[in-house]
Design a protein with these regions (language model features):
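Conserved GNAT-fold acetyl-CoA-binding loop/helix
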Residues: 29-50
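Acyl-donor (CoA/ACP) binding surface of acyl/acetyltransferases
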Residues: 1-28, 32, 59-162
Length: 162
């Protein structure tokens, strides 16, 4: 399955994505905001992701439609949780806003969801702006424990209903 936006194609991962995936996720400025992605990100991790991890429903490689360059990842679960990361080289260009817009359309129209939600970290302002631009509202804050840091932080939750 492929999904399209004005500038992007959301598609399945391929073996050709491996080198770029490793490069994008070995950037500390990207990895520090991802909770489920290991750092450093190795070839072993990329092989597993391409062969198995990305094969679950509704996980997409985010690519630029003009050159097929991998720039990030987006997913939406059958229960409506949405997640996205974009490589630092591609920040501040509106790609995340464009991706989330397409995924909310997919969630409501194709998956027939009545609510889509996302969570981020209080100190990570960019995804909060992306969600707000897409009509999401901050509905609650939950504490979460940061592994390896040894303290609790606030995790804002955002929701959008159909």
């Amino acid at each position: 399955m492929e999904l399209y936006t004005k500038r992007l194609i959301l598609r399945q991962y391929t073996e050709d994505d491996k080198e770029t995936l490793i490069k994008l996720l070995n950037d500390k400025e990207v990895s520090k905001w991802t909770e489920r992605i290991p750092f450093p990100y190795t070839e072993k991790h990329a092989n597993w992701w391409i062969d198995k991890g990305s094969k679950v429903k509704y996980v997409f490689a985010v690519t630029i439609n003009k050159n097929n360059a991998l720039i990030g990842n987006v997913n939406i679960t059958p229960k409506g949780e949405i997640g996205c990361w974009i490589g630092r080289k591609y920040w501040k260009r509106g790609f995340a806003t464009e991706v989330i817009s397409r995924m909310k359309k997919f969630g409501f129209e194709e998956l027939k969801l009545v609510k889509i939600w996302a969570a981020t970290r209080e100190e990570n302002k960019a995804p909060m702006r992306v969600l707000e631009k897409n009509g999401f509202s901050r509905v609650k804050d939950r504490p979460y424990y940061v592994e390896g840091v040894g303290n609790t932080r606030i995790r804002p939750h955002f929701e959008l209903t159909k």
